[in-house]
Amino acid sequence: MKKRILGFLSLPLFFLVGCTNKDVAVSGTITIKEVEIEDVSSLEVYNINLKSGFSSFGAKIVCLNDDSKKKRAVITASSDLIEKVSIKESGATLKISASSHERYLTDSCEIYLYNCVFNSINLASATQMIANDGTLREDKLDIDLKGASSLEINKLALNEIDVELSGASSFKASKIELNDASFDLSGASNVKIESLIADDIELSLAGASSFKASGSVDKIEVDASGASKVDMINVSSSKVSGHLSGASSGYFSFRGSLKLDLSGASTLYYLGDSSSLDVSTSGGSSVKKYN
């Protein structure tokens, strides 16, 4: 897991780069271009900076399967923009990008990736991605989202997942079943999982980030700071431990033990046996029964 300070240092740089982009008008008819793909397992999407009116955004990526089994990328955009977007393979990595110094004045850029299975996803520049069933590996999955990027998945069953979000990025899932999970959030990033089944989960949140889930997790380890929020009141757990600091809040439901260190006006809301609480508080922090 990367050190927290790197996330904070990258935020000003990201916005500085965004402000110095040159606006480039693109025209031409909406065109569809297909690019054949070999055997790739990693995806990187970056520097596709788009603007329409007052809104700035990135490319939309959709991963899906069809009966052809043919690995390919299909991009739909104006003919001018298609010429500026690079889709190439570098070893086992599929890289999709454009110029880091340009922002394209257009309504959309959609890229469909067919019959690829990824174990590593790196998105930047406000990229929006939807990963359908069967497009993500079921052993170990690494996800890194930067600069207001987002990833949405339906259901996933796997051994291990490592998620790192920064710069107001987001991760959403309907259902995840796994053994071990690690989530590292900074810069007002957020995670929402409707149904989470896991053995162990490690959470690290900073900079007004948020994590919300329902389900069942055996062991939860949390470190939340900078007005972050962890809402796992609808997650049944046997053991919760960690730290809340800097006006952060944690909502937990436990059936075994809960051991937390609260500081800097942080708040713990809990459901469970109060006799099993082991909580230290300082700096105006508080512990409250959830109702």
Please annotate each region the language model reported:
Residues 2-291:
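Intrinsically disordered, low-complexity terminal regions
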